[in-house]
Amino acid sequence: VLFHGYQGSAETMLMIGYLFNHDFGFNVLIPDLRGHGQSEPSAISMGWTERTEVVDWIRTADSLFGGNTQIVLYGVSMGAATTMIAAAEESLPACVRCAVEDCGYTSTRDIFADSWEKQCRLPLFPLFHLSDLWCRILYGWSFAKASPLDAVHRCRLPMLFIHGDKDSVVPVEMVHRLYEAKIGDKELWILSGVDHGAAYLHDPQIYAQRVRTFVEHWFECPAILEQ
């Protein structure tokens, strides 16, 4: 089950979908997250509310593909953040064997603060804090709540972390924090000279080999979540 990034859609994931389907032999489900693509207009929560929808999509995939499936979660950017948060949910179905996150961020607060300082060149206080308060009042979630960093502290699912060391959107230091915080089985792959979301295009063959090796290893361990 594959998840796109902010302002993306299922269509923007077709190359990765082709990789998993044609090259790896997987059935693939690529949904439009809330407020994106053909989904109904809705407030985007950078992974927090979306996490429950991920669980629903997993159950849908399990049903569509026979009810006795093994599932890998894959996400890019906001989709990666959503994947990490969902992977720590207690309601995550046991059919999920592993997850791959590509260029996800530590928390909505961190990525918004970093972008704010880069683009606005204004102090965080008070406008940033007022924006956070507005989200709390209007939508019921805060920037700090949507936190993959907190989620991976609780996540037992094997996870592959992918990031470019020249990422201009999500600083590479964030993936190091995520990797260090992740409990259980994990792998970290830093690509030299690669910008945000460009890891696959940088070298499709190496990318495919690395992802496939990780995923197939955990598909050989069907009882990983029961350990």
Annotate the PLM regions.
Residues L201-Q227:
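Catalytic active-site module of serine/aspartate enzymes centered on a nucleophile-bearing elbow/loop
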Residues G17-E40:
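Conserved alpha/beta-hydrolase
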Residues I85-A144, D150:
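Hydrolase active-site cap/lid region
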Residues Y179-A198, P204:
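Catalytic histidine neighborhood in serine/cysteine hydrolases
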Residues I44-F65:
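Alpha/beta-hydrolase active-site loop
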Residues R154-R156, F161-H163, D167:
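Short beta-strand/loop motif that positions the catalytic acidic residue
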Residues Y6-F20:
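The serine-hydrolase catalytic nucleophile loop
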Residues I16, P148, L157, P171-E180:
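Short alpha-helix in the alpha/beta-hydrolase fold that links the catalytic acid
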